Amino acid sequence: DNSLLIKMEKIPVIPESFMGIMKFSSKEEYAYLCMLLMYLEDRDAQEQFILSQLTEYITANLPGDISDWTLYTNRRKLIRVLRFAVEQGIVGITDGGTL
């Protein structure tokens, strides 16, 4: 059992109510989660990063308004994704701050 691996499953033809992340309310949040996972894939397990590095990565890889950080809604969606990632043990906070 490797705790650093994530299992991806095939999406069924008909989505069921139990599928998905209940804390997410938009497709953009799933896109941010995928971007976060892609960003982390290129880093060592204990390597630290700052939020601006992640947002620069997302901006470079996601076109359009979804990566416009001047929009409050985009910042809130990213924070929701980061909170989920912390709850799941995907990332940790080392700066003493909270999301």
PLM feature segments, named:
Residues 3-9, 79, 87-99:
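Accessory beta->alpha helical hairpin/"wing" motif in late/C-terminal subdomains of nucleic-acid enzymes
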Residues 1, 58, 62, 82-86:
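Hydrophobic, Leu/Ile/Phe/Ala-enriched alpha-helical segments that form helix-helix packing faces
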Residues 45-69:
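Short acidic, hydrophobic short linear motifs in intrinsically disordered regions
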Residues 38-43, 84-92:
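A structural feature that tracks compact, well-ordered secondary-structure segments
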Residues 1-22, 82:
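Eukaryotic partner-binding/assembly regions in large regulatory complexes
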Residues 68-87:
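Short amphipathic alpha-helical interaction segments
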Residues 23-30, 56-62:
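Short, solvent-exposed interaction modules
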Residues 27-48:
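Positively charged, polyanion-binding regions of nucleic-acid-associated proteins
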